[in-house]
Amino acid sequence: MFKQISKSPLCFRLENTGARKLYLSAGIHGDETSGPHTLINLLKEPEFFDDLDVTIFPILNMYGHKHNQRHNEADKDLNRDFKSQKEKETQDHIKLMNDRYDIALCLHEGRDADGVYIYKPNKNKRLDVMESILKAMTLQMPIDDRHKRMHSLVEPGILQDVKYKEMHETEAIYLANRGVDAFTIEVPHGYSMNVREKTLRAGIKQAVRILS
């Protein structure tokens, strides 16, 4: 059973001593709703995680989530704050990130996307893990094809995080810089909530299989 270990930010832990560790987060951009929806539902399904040790942050930007806006109350993008750590939400979040996770998935939505894709931090070399998770997600929806001509494209559906993100440190980059196999998975906002949730669950379940 998941236990709540913090109210601000919301954080839940499924503790299994000695097991491999999975980190999941969503809602750092308040107008991206399928990630929080998916993780809140998964909190009711501890059996989904096959005896892993799991940490879940379902809604990292509570103000943005309540007001359906990307930024926090101070109009700051929390996913560009991990280098400076100026925002209280980021400071409180980092205090709870005290484990060496085996895999970390940061759940996001792409507003203009037409399929799934993954952002790869520079420090993360585990393309095999990303490819496996992306493949599982594509059973629910196609790979986004907007990035074919972008220099940041590593391979179809996997993009290198750009220098701006590396400079300011997104959540995934912060984790990757500390030795975690972390990356951002994105689903398109234009699909129904049901399909977005199924796609995110498929990616998470593949991460569970990799670690089990």
Annotate each PLM feature.
Residues 1-212:
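Structured catalytic-domain cores with a bias toward divalent-metal coordination
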